[in-house]
Regions:
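Helix-turn-helix
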Residues: 7, 11-57
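Short, Lys/Arg-enriched anionic-surface-contact patches
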Residues: 1-4
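Amphipathic alpha-helical linker/stalk segments
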Residues: 54-94
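Hydrophobic/aromatic-rich alpha-helical bundle segments in the mid-to-C-terminal region
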Residues: 127-131, 135, 145-192, 202-206
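Amphipathic alpha-helical packing segments from all-alpha helical-bundle domains
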Residues: 103-116, 120-149
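Hydrophobic/aromatic residues within well-ordered alpha-helical segments
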Residues: 47, 54, 58, 62, ...
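Short amphipathic alpha-helical interaction/hinge segments
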Residues: 62-66, 106, 123, 166-177
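Amphipathic alpha-helical segments that line or abut small-molecule/effector binding pockets
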Residues: 81-104, 109, 113-117, 156, ...
Length: 206
């Protein structure tokens, strides 16, 4: 039964990424899995339940990745700034892994494409797009860079300078740019070189 549930999630996400969440029906998902719609309802109550399962898996993987690279698990607060547990080396390693996963991992790349496709059609999808791919990463990096600079505004500008090219490289990768990961490596190396004090001060705060 677990295998069938996983296949349903996998095929549903593939269809969502190709056609958009709104355009896909339960019948189409069932057909892609090779079962009848009534059989699908034995595993999920409907399309929304399948989507919720996908999001739950996404959240679990995101948390696992943060722990693997010893990164803060969420944006910092005044009492517990995210930058206190991060170093520039970890930020770069974590960002490389995130980029690789968002482009090469089947599950994550499809999730990203689904959000990209649906962000203008569905307010919830737009919120999730911001959370995972736009405002969320910028806010996360702003908190991480804050201990190394004089103001939050400066930290936000650094976050934009660091993440902006990475964000653009997602689109270039989707357009066929297979050197995207190498370009990201060069960008991060240059960023660290141009901001050596930031790297040292952030590390000292860890």
């Amino acid at each position: 039964m677990r295998d069938t549930k996983e296949r349903i999630q996998s095929e549903a996400l593939r269809l969502f990424a190709e056609n958009g969440y709104q355009a896909v029906t339960v019948e189409q998902i069932a057909a892609a899995v090779g079962i009848k719609a009534p059989s699908l309802y034995k595993h999920y109550s409907g399309k929304r339940a399948i989507f919720d399962g996908i999001v739950h898996q996404m959240e679990a993987r995101d948390l696992q990745q943060a722990r693997r690279y010893q990164m803060p698990e969420e944006n910092g607060t005044a009492e517990n700034p995210a930058g206190e547990t991060a170093t520039m080396e970890r930020v770069c390693a974590f960002s490389r892994a995130q980029f690789r996963d968002w482009t090469e991992d089947k599950f994550l790349s499809r999730f990203r494409r689904m959000l990209t496709l649906e962000q203008y059609r569905d307010p919830e999808m737009a919120r999730m797009y911001d959370q995972y791919l736009s405002a969320g990463p910028v806010g996360y990096l702003t908190d991480i860079f804050r201990p190394g600079v004089d103001s939050r505004e400066e930290a936000r500008l650094l976050a934009l300078a660091f993440y902006g090219p990475m964000f653009l490289l997602y689109s270039l990768y989707d357009s066929g740019e297979r050197n995207a990961a190498a370009l990201l490596d060069r960008h991060m190396a240059r960023f660290a070189k141009e901001h050596p004090a930031l790297a040292v001060r952030t590390q000292k705060e860890g």
